[in-house]
Amino acid sequence: MMEFIYPHTHLVAGVDEVGRGPLVGAVVTAAVILDPLKPIVGLADSKKLSEKRRLALFDEIKEKAIAWSLGRAEPHEIDELNILHATMLAMQRAVAGLAVTPEYVLVDGNRCPALPMPSMAVVKGDSRVAEISAASILAKVTRDAEMAELDLTFPQYGFAQHKGYPTAFHLERLAEHGATAHHRRSFAPVRRALGIAS
């Protein structure tokens, strides 16, 4: 893995996404500029934290960050653009939504969206860069809450449990009940459930 050198600048935003793999719902992104004078203990990749810890950190990040913002790309945008381009769009929206303009942006993964300021992709950034960890927590808690809400409308699919990922249970329910308006039509399992040849 390439050595990561933190940029020598004051306002650094971290950006991450949640929800590229699910068959349903939006891809959700977050951008966060942390305040070095208000450290947050325990930031880590959101996937490695318990739900209780994520929720506590979610509130602390929003309270202590210099700026934070959420972005998203809806299922119809994912279907029109493809998941990669929709994710880049959602990241651009998160950065554009920051109340304070960052001087530099660090993005989790190996690809950066086109941004008006310098940026760098950081592989495994969600466990290496505090700002990206914070962004991953905001994005995951937000998307998980949306899946829990969708579960209330469509309890037969089990969205609260699998968060829309293609688990055996989800695929079984998709075959049995068909797709909701929130499913991503361009994803192969959804196309199969709708009887659309891929």
UniProtKB/Swiss-Prot annotation:
Top-level taxon in the UniProt lineage: Bacteria
Catalytic activity as recorded in UniProt: Endonucleolytic cleavage to 5'-phosphomonoester
Keywords: Cytoplasm, Endonuclease, Hydrolase, Manganese, Metal-binding, Nuclease
Cofactor dependence: Mn(2+); Mg(2+)
EC number: 3.1.26.4
UniProt cofactor note: Manganese or magnesium. Binds 1 divalent metal ion per monomer in the absence of substrate. May bind a second metal ion after substrate binding.
Keyword Calcium: no
Positions bound to a divalent metal cation: D16, E17, D108
Biological function: Endonuclease that specifically degrades the RNA of RNA-DNA hybrids.
Listed name of the protein: Ribonuclease HII
Organism: Cronobacter sakazakii (strain ATCC BAA-894)
Gene behind the chain: rnhB
